Amino acid sequence: MLSSTLRVAVVCVSNVNRSMEAHSILRRKGLSVRSFGTESHVRLPGPRPNRPVVYDFATTYKEMYNDLLRKDRERYTRNGILHILGRNERIKPGPERFQECTDFFDVIFTCEESVYDTVVEDLCSREQQTFQPVHVINMDIQDTLEDATLGAFLICEICQCLQQSDDMEDNLEELLLQMEEKAGKSFLHTVCFY
């Protein structure tokens, strides 16, 4: 498969940490990538664990950054949120919801099982138009800076292997089994159709 033809999406809950870290790394490697969230709002860590800071998906990363800077620069610098939002702003203006995207992808990576379920349910509820297959692969990635980076590199490695594959459809299952052994992670995988 030619590198320019593999169309990749990465989806997490809020399109802030895990999907954007993967977006950043895949983009640097020259892949065609988009990233998304699935929830109705973006939730970021707040002053207490049960009090997140909530934004609408229409809020830009720059607006979130400036709002958190005003609220508590020290807290949001210390926990890495300002760094994450700064990185995100360099990639795209703001978070996007997967359910509102009409683009077609070859592979969609999700970062937790509930997101995988939402993506598969959304794809199955759409009217099929082209019957083009899309592989949906879940890899559980904890929502921490370190785990987001490790998960992004694993997603990148899978994408690079798929780019070198003569037949993605035939080789994907074997590749995922090899990656499960190598990384010590298990994957969920299904095929949906556009």
From Swiss-Prot:
Q: Which domain of life is it from?
A: Eukaryota
* Compartment(s) of residence: Nucleus
- Name the InterPro entries for this protein: Ptyr_pPase_sf, RNA_pol_II_suA
Q: Does the keyword field hold Aminoacyl-tRNA synthetase?
A: no
Which Pfam families does this one have? Ssu72
The catalytic activity of this protein is classed by the Enzyme Commission as 3.1.3.16
GO terms of biological process kind? mRNA processing; termination of RNA polymerase II transcription
Report whether Transport shows up as a keyword of the record: no
Which GO molecular function entries does the Swiss-Prot or TrEMBL record give? Answer: RNA polymerase II CTD heptapeptide repeat phosphatase activity
One Gene Ontology term, aspect cellular component: mRNA cleavage and polyadenylation specificity factor complex
Which controlled-vocabulary keywords does the entry list?
Hydrolase, mRNA processing, Nucleus, Protein phosphatase
* Catalytic activity from the UniProt record: O-phospho-L-seryl-[protein] + H2O = L-seryl-[protein] + phosphate; O-phospho-L-threonyl-[protein] + H2O = L-threonyl-[protein] + phosphate
Which EC class, in a word? hydrolase
Q: Which family does it belong to?
A: Belongs to the SSU72 phosphatase family.
Q: What does this protein do?
A: Protein phosphatase that catalyzes the dephosphorylation of the C-terminal domain of RNA polymerase II. Plays a role in RNA processing and termination.
The name of this protein is RNA polymerase II subunit A C-terminal domain phosphatase SSU72 like protein 4
Q: Which gene encodes it?
A: SSU72L4
